[in-house]
Amino acid sequence: MKTFSAKPQSVTRDWYVVDATDKTLGRLATEIARRLRGKHKPEYTPHVDTGDYIVVVNAEKVRVTGNKAQAKNYYRHTGYPGGLRSMSFEKLIDHAPERVIESAVKGMLPKGPLGRAMYSKLKVYAGAEHPHAAQQPLELNL
């Protein structure tokens, strides 16, 4: 019996919607990253993007444990000398709640062109509304 290897043109992708309300950030991000990679499918192939599309709603209601709300910092650089900026989880969840989930998931995906293709299938929205109703996403309970 030969080992199955998925071809990029033969991959079928589903759309899923995930509600992040009162979910722990890391536990939610690991399951999202797993599904973006396609590791939940029997036809998973490491060098082919076999993952599904994931729409995350209510990103502003995601939780962290312990004192991470104050202690966890997110860093970015403006591109100018001395341009390192940091923001705590508390401030970032008020300012741009999508970035919290996006950065957690992005760190769990492969680095390189394949990882960027997987990351592009992640859609995160702060509120309960999303513009992907035409894709008829399935509810995913994590």
UniProtKB/Swiss-Prot annotation:
Subunit and interaction comment: Part of the 50S ribosomal subunit.
Keywords: Ribonucleoprotein, Ribosomal protein
HAMAP family attached to this UniProt entry: Ribosomal_uL13
Any single GO BP term: translation
GO CC field: cytosolic large ribosomal subunit
Entry keyword Ribosomal protein: yes
Disulfide bonds: none
Gene from which this protein is expressed: rplM
Domain of life: Bacteria
Organism listed in the record: Chromohalobacter salexigens (strain ATCC BAA-138 / DSM 3043 / CIP 106854 / NCIMB 13768 / 1H11)
Keyword DNA-binding carried by entry: no
Protein name in the entry: Large ribosomal subunit protein uL13
